[in-house]
Design a protein with these regions (language model features):
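Metal-dependent DNA phosphodiester-chemistry modules and their immediately adjacent helices/loops
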Residues: 92, 265-292, 299
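Basic, short loop/linker segments at the boundary and entry of helix-turn-helix/winged-helix-like folds
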Residues: 61-117, 133-146, 212
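RNase H-like nuclease fold core
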Residues: 84-87, 95-99, 147-235, 239, ...
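Conserved beta-strand -> loop -> alpha-helix junction used to position metal-binding or nucleic-acid-contacting
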Residues: 232-239, 244-280
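Acidic/histidine-rich catalytic cores and adjacent linkers
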Residues: 2, 283-408
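Subset of Sec-pathway N-terminal targeting signals
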Residues: 1-18, 23, 30-66, 70-73
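Electropositive nucleic-acid engagement tracts
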Residues: 57-63, 67, 119-166
């Protein structure tokens, strides 16, 4: 058995050098040699234990020199690490694994933190060198952020609650390289409010197009992960969604977003008419009851129908799903009649991605959005406003469907 390495650390000498102004940490810091020796001593113990275990099991084995690699420390600087080998090539070090080039998670955590704030690889590399006096290539940073992909896959397939009282669906578009060219793809975000009143992203789904078949696959995925019931789903007029949701969740009420409908309507109204048109339209969607709203919609059609038939036709065709919120009290109305709650998530996504332009593949986008979700979740610690009253009202309107979840 090879003689165990001794730790050679002269405390008094280190103290004198520190007093003379030499740094303890960072590049060429005084502590780097100690970290190197401690790490190599631990590796020596590992390989000796491995060889001894082979001997106990009747396998001939012995040491076979060292491999050398540069270890990038955190505040303790960088150093050359000698990792022992064995003749059979079966030794797998655990203290510092074969392809590991840091001895702490601190750098990786800092890199992921900066990446989650939307910083690009070059800026991250610069900041890491400023903080730790360690040079990290953009390729290494990319490899570190790629570790998020496994977390994304696990998150995408995680079990869901059996019921979410409210669910919103909305899309945000990005340029992604596909087949050698950049194409526009939509990222559909599914946001729910659980029985505790807390927001939760249920899933992210990428697609070049929407439609009943696409939404059927999304809803089937949610169902397969444990979601059995949604009371009210709010969407922005996504094509084919109301039909698809009735297939998987036939009892769910579908509310089309009023704000999206207004925006789409104004695209077809002349600028000079928009102020007056909006004054009349507001009487429709701000009415206290559905009957009053329908009276105002008739007046709107009488006044503007000939000039803007496509706009009034859209309101009439979608009225069944646009008017769902009228049956509920104001506490529930405020929650469901727009998709503002999910648009705020997309605003956070845009902050992260605004400097990116386009993405080389889907994973590069998903891992960044996933970090954005993790950052948002840190703030989602409290229930949505007035949740206790809202939940009580839901229990009345959806009699029996919340009984299994209500602890009363």
């Amino acid at each position: 058995m090879q003689e165990e390495k001794q730790i050679d650390f002269d405390f008094n000498e280190i103290l004198n050098q520190f007093r003379s102004g030499k740094r303890l940490t960072g590049k060429d810091g005084l502590l780097a040699p100690l970290i190197k020796q401690l790490t190599e001593a631990a590796l020596e113990a590992e390989v000796e234990s491995h060889i001894a275990n082979d001997a106990l099991n009747g396998r001939a084995n012995r040491r076979n020199g060292f491999n050398s690699k540069t270890i990038k420390g955190t505040s303790d600087g960088s150093f050359e690490l000698e990792t022992p080998r064995n003749r059979n090539g079966t030794f797998e070090p655990q203290i510092v694994k074969k392809h590991q080039n840091t001895i702490s998670d601190e750098i990786e955590e800092k890199i992921l933190s900066m990446y989650g704030l939307g910083m690009n690889y070059v800026d991250i590399s610069t900041h890491i060198e400023e903080i730790y006096q360690v040079s990290i290539s953009t390729a290494t940073i990319s490899a570190i952020t790629d570790k998020i992909i496994d977390k994304v896959k696990s998150w995408q397939s995680r079990p869901l609650d059996t019921i979410y009282p409210f669910v919103w669906l909305d899309a945000i578009h990005y340029k992604i390289k596909d087949g050698g060219k950049y194409v526009s793809k939509a990222v559909y975000t599914v946001l729910g409010v659980n029985m505790e009143g807390r927001k939760e992203i249920l899933g992210l789904y990428l697609s070049e197009s929407e439609g009943a078949n696409f939404w059927l696959s999304v809803l089937t995925d949610l169902n397969n992960r444990g979601l059995q019931d949604i009371l009210i789903a709010s969407v922005d007029g996504l094509k084919g969604f109301p039909e698809a949701i009735k297939t998987i969740f036939p009892k769910t009420e579908v509310q089309l977003c009023i704000i999206h409908q207004i925006r789409n309507s104004l695209r077809y109204v002349a600028s000079k008419d928009q102020k007056e048109f909006m004054k009349d339209l507001r009487l429709v969607y701000e009415a206290s009851t559905k009957d009053l709203a329908e009276d105002e919609l008739l007046k709107l059609e009488e006044k503007w129908g000939k000039k803007y038939p496509i706009v009034l036709q859209s309101w009439n065709n979608k009225w069944e799903n646009l008017s769902v919120y009228f049956k509920y009290p104001k506490e529930i109305r405020k929650v469901i009649y727009t998709t503002n709650i999910i648009e705020s998530v997309h605003r956070q996504f845009r902050k992260l991605t605004k400097t990116k332009g386009a993405f080389p593949n889907e994973n590069s986008l998903l891992k960044l959005l996933f970090m954005g979700i993790k950052n948002a979740e840190k703030k989602w610690t409290m229930p949505v406003w007035n949740w206790s009253l809202t939940l009580s009202q839901l229990a009345i309107f959806f009699e029996g469907r919340l009984d299994s979840e209500l602890k009363i």
